Amino acid sequence: MAHENVWFSHPRRFGKGSRQCRVCSSHTGLIRKYDLNICRQCFRERASDIGFNKYR
């Protein structure tokens, strides 16, 4: 097998590798609540556009 064929040849169905941010395709810091699937960095940038308000 060539080097390019080895990495990520196994299908990712569950776990952190299977999910990514719908904005920037990052795998880290993912917010899955309410089926957002956005990383926390992108959420902070777009929270008011989505409709989340900060009360405090």
UniProtKB/Swiss-Prot annotation:
Q: Name one GO cellular component term.
A: extracellular region
Co-factor: note: Binds 1 zinc ion per subunit.
Gene Ontology molecular function terms on file = structural constituent of ribosome; zinc ion binding
Asked if the Swiss-Prot or TrEMBL record annotates the protein with the keyword rRNA-binding, the reply is no
Read off the Pfam families from this record.
Ribosomal_S14 (PF00253)
- Transmembrane annotation, as ranges: none
Q: Where does Zn(2+) bind?
A: 21, 24, 39, 42
An example Gene Ontology biological process = cytoplasmic translation
This protein's cofactor list reads:
Zn(2+)
Q: Which UniProt keywords apply?
A: Metal-binding, Ribonucleoprotein, Ribosomal protein, Zinc
Gene3D superfamilies from the entry? 30s Ribosomal Protein S14, Chain N
The yes or no answer to whether the keyword Transmembrane helix is present is no
Family as reported in the entry's similarity comment: Belongs to the universal ribosomal protein uS14 family.
Query: What name goes with this protein?
Result: Small ribosomal subunit protein uS14
